[in-house]
Regions:
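Short, high-confidence coil segments that cap the C-terminus of an alpha-helix
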Residues: 41-43, 102-105, 217, 271-273
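A short glycine/small-residue-enriched secondary-structure motif
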Residues: 63-79
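Short, charged beta->alpha transition segments
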Residues: 64, 93-100, 130-131
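Divalent metal-dependent hydrolysis catalytic cores, especially in the metallo-beta-lactamase
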Residues: 105-113
Length: 314
């Protein structure tokens, strides 16, 4: 018999310990990551118990009449004990739907965890949601490099990497608070110029998250004439490197500085990781593909994996 308990602060230690020993021990599900922006979202995370034993967690927030997994995270979905099997997640999903209906929820928006982030197979949730009539509402194209068997880069990309080296660009990992703020300022200038947008995180927030998770969050910057002209904020998971942010100013694009950053990241993590996820190249819930952006990512040897969102409407 599955019972649901809504997460509260007193459960933080239990939550975090469960994450560490789950099929998906991803640091961004740690409460110290999830709660850095708790003022922006009404948290409604859930804990699932089977005969008083915790078997699954579900990071969620509520907005109006929707339960969403989770708007403050790249993706969410059930985080399962390694002992959990299909029938248990079927039961958890049934209880989730009953819980949602009891709260007057009209829609569950479910951003499931892409399979490359699983340390053990963990798609019981997709099958369980299918049984309850869930439909795909969003498909976003992300470009992923197989680090153990990368595809060849074209000559043009290699020449840009060589040019950056000739121009004296040096890639360094930076750790200071001010470095993160400087990089996010660069990111915002680029986003504003090309997309009329700003970064999801502020520089202060990224510096805070780095201080909380220094082994998982890294800033690699291209330095040219003592200035950051390009860089990447990298999230490091068990078998995946995710390029959370990429930015390059006009000079960096001219001399291949960001190309060098990405090339060095590939070489650095190739011995220990399986995948490099360079992120999504879609807009408008996946309906618009930025062909220039995805082409650039593909030129490093990446190909498409998708991020899917499912919905159940009551």
């Amino acid at each position: 018999m599955i019972k649901i308990k809504q997460y509260s602060k007193e459960n933080e230690k239990v939550w975090d310990q469960f994450i560490e020993n789950s099929k998906n021990p991803l640091f961004m599900f740690n409460r110290k990551y999830m709660e850095y922006h708790e003022d922006r979202f009404q948290d409604n995370s859930l804990m699932f118990y089977d005969e008083n034993k915790l078997v699954a967690l579900l990071p969620m927030n509520v907005r109006n009449d929707k339960l969403i997994t989770h708007e403050g995270l790249t993706f969410g979905g059930f985080i399962e004990s390694t002992n959990v099997k299909q029938h248990t997640i079927n039961d958890c999903t049934s209880e989730l739907i009953s819980y949602a209906k009891g709260k007057g929820i009209k829609r569950i928006v479910y951003k499931h965890i892409p399979h490359m982030y699983h340390e053990q197979p963990s798609e019981e949730d997709i099958y369980a949601l299918f049984l309850h009539g869930a439909q795909i509402s969003k498909v976003e194209a992300a470009t992923v490099i197989n680090l153990r068997k990368p595809l060849k880069m074209p000559k043009g990309r290699k020449s840009q990497i060589s040019r950056a080296k000739r121009e004296g660009v040096v890639v360094k990992e930076l750790n200071d608070h001010d470095d993160y703020c400087e990089f996010i300022n660069l990111e915002n200038r680029v986003l504003s110029e090309h997309y009329g947008a700003t970064a999801t995180h502020t520089g202060e927030e990224m510096a805070l998250l780095h201080s909380r998770f220094p082994e998982h969050i890294h800033l690699y910057a291209a330095i040219y004439e003592y200035t950051i002209i390009a860089g990447a904020i990298v999230y490091e998971y068990g078998q995946v490197i995710h390029l959370q942010y990429l930015a390059a100013d006009d000079k960096a694009r001219e001399i291949g500085a960001l190309d060098l950053v990405i090339a060095e990241a590939i070489e650095k993590y190739r011995p220990t990781k399986l995948w490099l996820d360079s992120g999504k190249s879609t807009e408008d819930d996946g309906r618009f593909l930025n062909e220039g952006l995805i082409s650039q990512k593909e030129s490093f040897g990446g190909r498409t994996n998708v991020y899917e969102t499912l919905e159940i409407i009551f």
